[in-house]
Structures are given as structure tokens and as C-alpha cells.
Amino acid sequence: MLTVPPLIPRLLLALTPLATIAAAFFYFSQTNVLQPTPYIDEIFHIPQTQQYCKGHWNAWDSKITTPPGLYIIGYAWARMLTLTGLSESEACSTLSLRAVNLMAVVIYIPATLYIIQRRVWGSQAHFSAFSLVSFPLIWFYAALYYTDVWSTATVLMALAFALSPRVPFYMVQLSALMCAVSLFFRQTNILWAAVVAVIAIENSHYSNGAPPKNGALAQIFSTISYTFQIELPIFNILISYASVAVGFSFFLYINGGIALGDKDNHVAGNHIPQVFYCALFITTLGFPVWFTWAHLKAYISSSFSVLGLTVRPLFIFVLIPRLLKSYAIEHPFLLADNRHYVFYLWRRLLKPAIYSISVEDVMQSQDAIDPKTLDVISIGLKYALSAAIYFSLWNIWTTLTNSIPAAILVRGRGFNRRNGKSISPAIDLQCLTWPILLAMVFATLASLIPSPLIEPRYYILPYLFWRIYMTPTTAGKRVNTDARFLREWIWYMLINAATVYMFLYKPFEWAHEPGVLQRFMW
């Protein structure tokens, strides 16, 4: 790989905040020129917020499945805009409400990510934060009035408070409060609230004098032992986050389930392949950070180990294909809307590979291609997909387990997982531990498997938690990450440029709705 002088990536990275913000404003302005009316989910969110702006607090669209957090923020934003002299209709217009998400993407989320990355990455936090805020599934919705931006922002703020040094009482309270607020945007955030609670426990555990522990079992048992101690710090943490869980349980009881509306189309399933799709998503979008030739060499070398020669073929040729075929779900929403990229991904890749069906179903070329050739293509797709899934799962697990330091920091002093030097209390880093990793795995599985619809937005938080805690390594050594952050930012912005171009400048029409422009999006 081409070696770039260290100063060049650092200078270029210094320009990424300005470039990211400028691009977001350009995208926002173009969206409101070319698509001034509500689009797809906005046809539910914007009218609902406008009902609140009119004071109709009892009005509710039964098709809406998430709580009213976005609409409350939109209402508050509109009230503030009226103080500047705007009329109520102008302050609560589509343009004004979309600005709520733009504000989050260019101000709120970067600031929150900086705080988080300062605790996890140290001095490289500002580079990491602005690289990460350009993540396509966040950045794309800067110009649309969707719930995902503020749902993500509130979970990140809860994490930022939980990572505070020594986890003081008021920071725990603020973190738990933000966990509760996050539930007003997406109900499954309760699972990530549990992850934040574990992070707060680990932060309190090791910053209050626990001896460093090596190994998974030692760390897990040490954390469990600390959790059951009757001491004020852990009692404060448990009560704070348990209150959020109790409140959410009450909501489930009153509501009769997790979906707020349209319950017939939002029934929980057993969608194990959703985890596989998420793994592919994380590995693909995160490749500038994890990719090195040494990392790939380690994967290839492991193929010749005992486990590699036994377990890997079992997964690739038997287990993964069987799970895909037995538990894949073709949701009606997936088939009904050709405005989403996943519609084409399912029809042209996933479905032929999973069910080993001939691709002429998509290509409509049965007469042009020999049936035996089609069978070969189908089988090849099947095992190529299975191999890609296995590598993605291995990659995510390996990058995270390699990011767990050899020793946990104690009272601000210990091994710096970046350069091996001692750490001062001022920059005490909150590293990944085995309890945190297992909590992340649990939250990912519990949030994805019940979801029958393939939806990339469900992968935002699994991706962000992986990216926040994943430490790039080369042959087991920590590396300077400036060049990787720069490559990551370029990769994200290339994806953003492509998706924005398709969204804004490549519209199409449905035959049954002539004259109405449809647009491609995530």
C-alpha cells in the first residue's frame, strides 16, 4: 500500500469538517429545491408535526410506528423560529422541519462524537469524529425529516455521559435521562440503553480502583462481582438505568407490544439472516478502517489451522446457507417499493443466492442462457455470499477482540493501547472490555433478529458502536490512524455523492402515477 507522509493526511483531515458541513448544506438546499414536498416516510412525520404546531396534541396517525420524539423536537424548533418573525406555517413547513436534522448532523452529532472519541481515542478524536459524522446512513438523512438522526444522536449523548471520568452521580443521571429520551425516537433503543449501562458500570468499576484483569472470564466475573456490591457508585448506576427499563416495561404493558401503530405490518419474526446482512454492511462500509494486507493475511493463514480446516468449511458450506434458506424473510414492504436500494439487492443478489434459484427470475433470460450455466451461477452466488458472510463475522469479531487492551486502565494510569506509554488522568481512555463487547453483541442480535424487514437504517447503531470501539491494528501492533481516517472520510463521501446524485438527479416515474417523480434512496 502506498505510504503517505504523516503530515499530509493530518492537513487534509483538518479540512474535512468544513468540507463535510459545506456538502451537507449544498445537499440540503438542493433537496428542498428539487423535492420540496414530503417524501416517503416524511408524508407521515411532517403532517404529524404540523398537527402539534397547530396545538392538536390528541391527533395521531395510526400508521406511525414510533413514539413522538421527532415531532416534539420539530414543534420546539418551530416555536423558536416564530420568535424570529416567521409565521407559524413557515416555521412548521417542510423546509423548516428538515432543518432539524441538518442541525443535528452539522452541530450536535459531531460535538457528541468528539466527546466520545476523546474518551476512547484520545488526541485523534476530532479527526475520528468528523470522519464518522459523514457516515452515509447519518449524512444522507441530514436533508430529510426522518427519526433516525435524532434517535442516533440521543443514544450517542447517553454514551458520552456514561464515559465521563469517574462517572459522577449527575453524569449517570444525565446518561439515563438521554437513554429515556432516545426511546421517544425508536423503541429498540432500550437495548442500546442496556449497553450504555454496562459501559457506565465498567467505567465506574475500573476508575474507582479495581485491579486490572486480563482475559474474558476474569473481566466478566470481576464486573459481576462489582455489580453486586452494595456501594453508592454502583447503586446509583443500577437505579438510574433500571428506572429507564421499568418505564419502558410500563409502555410495553400499556401499548400491548413494541410497535406503536400499524402493528399488522410490524410483527416480530425470527430473522437470523438480518444479522448476516448487518455484518456485510459493517464490513463493506468500514473497510478503510479495518483493511490491511496483514489483516487479510491473518484470515488466510487461519484457514490452515485446525479450526480453519474444520469449522470454517462447516459454516460456509452448511450452517450459513441453511440458516439463510430456513430463516430469510421476504417482507411485503421489501417487494412493494422499488425506490430503495435494498429492493434491487434482494431481487438480484440475495434471493437468487439464498434460495439457489436460477437468476433468470431476475434477468428474464431463460432462453438465452443454458440451464446448467444458470445452476452454476446460482450455486456460485450461494457460496460466495456464504463466504462473504463468514469473513464479515470473523472480521467484526477479530477487530473488536483485538481492540481489548492487555490490561484495563486503573485510576487514569496504565497501558496506552495506542502507543504503549503511560496515561495521565487528564486523558484516561475508556477502552473496550469483554463485558462491553458481549453487551454490544446481545443488543445487535436482539434488535435485528426480530425485525422482518431488511432495512439498512437498523444497522446504524451496531455500526457506530463497532466503529467507536474498534482499534485498527497491523500484525498485532497499534497503528497511526490519520491515513485511515482520511481514507474513511473519502470513502464515505464518495458513497454520499453517489446516493445524493441518484436521489436528486435520477428521478423516475411509476406508470400508475404519471407526473409524480420518485427518487432512489437507502
UniProtKB/Swiss-Prot annotation:
It comes from Yarrowia lipolytica (strain CLIB 122 / E 150). Belongs to the ALG10 glucosyltransferase family. It is a multi-pass membrane protein. Signal peptide: none annotated. Keywords: Endoplasmic reticulum, Glycosyltransferase, Membrane, Transferase, Transmembrane, Transmembrane helix. It is found in: Endoplasmic reticulum membrane. Pathway: Protein modification; protein glycosylation. GO terms for biological process: dolichol-linked oligosaccharide biosynthetic process; protein N-linked glycosylation. This is Dol-P-Glc:Glc(2)Man(9)GlcNAc(2)-PP-Dol alpha-1,2-glucosyltransferase. One of its GO terms (cellular component) is endoplasmic reticulum membrane. InterPro entries: Alg10. GO terms for molecular function: dolichyl pyrophosphate Glc2Man9GlcNAc2 alpha-1,2-glucosyltransferase activity. Its EC number is 2.4.1.256. Dol-P-Glc:Glc(2)Man(9)GlcNAc(2)-PP-Dol alpha-1,2-glucosyltransferase that operates in the biosynthetic pathway of dolichol-linked oligosaccharides, the glycan precursors employed in protein asparagine (N)-glycosylation. The assembly of dolichol-linked oligosaccharides begins on the cytosolic side of the endoplasmic reticulum membrane and finishes in its lumen. The sequential addition of sugars to dolichol pyrophosphate produces dolichol-linked oligosaccharides containing fourteen sugars, including two GlcNAcs, nine mannoses and three glucoses. The keyword Transit peptide does not apply. It catalyses: an alpha-D-Glc-(1->3)-alpha-D-Glc-(1->3)-alpha-D-Man-(1->2)-alpha-D-Man-(1->2)-alpha-D-Man-(1->3)-[alpha-D-Man-(1->2)-alpha-D-Man-(1->3)-[alpha-D-Man-(1->2)-alpha-D-Man-(1->6)]-alpha-D-Man-(1->6)]-beta-D-Man-(1->4)-beta-D-GlcNAc-(1->4)-alpha-D-GlcNAc-diphospho-di-trans,poly-cis-dolichol + a di-trans,poly-cis-dolichyl beta-D-glucosyl phosphate = a alpha-D-Glc-(1->2)-alpha-D-Glc-(1->3)-alpha-D-Glc-(1->3)-alpha-D-Man-(1->2)-alpha-D-Man-(1->2)-alpha-D-Man-(1->3)-[alpha-D-Man-(1->2)-alpha-D-Man-(1->3)-[alpha-D-Man-(1->2)-alpha-D-Man-(1->6)]-alpha-D-Man-(1->6)]-beta-D-Man-(1->4)-beta-D-GlcNAc-(1->4)-alpha-D-GlcNAc-diphospho-di-trans,poly-cis-dolichol + a di-trans,poly-cis-dolichyl phosphate + H(+). The keyword tRNA-binding does not apply. The chain crosses the membrane at residues 8-28, 96-116, 125-145, 152-172, 181-201, 234-254, 275-295, 300-320, 388-410, 434-454, 488-508.
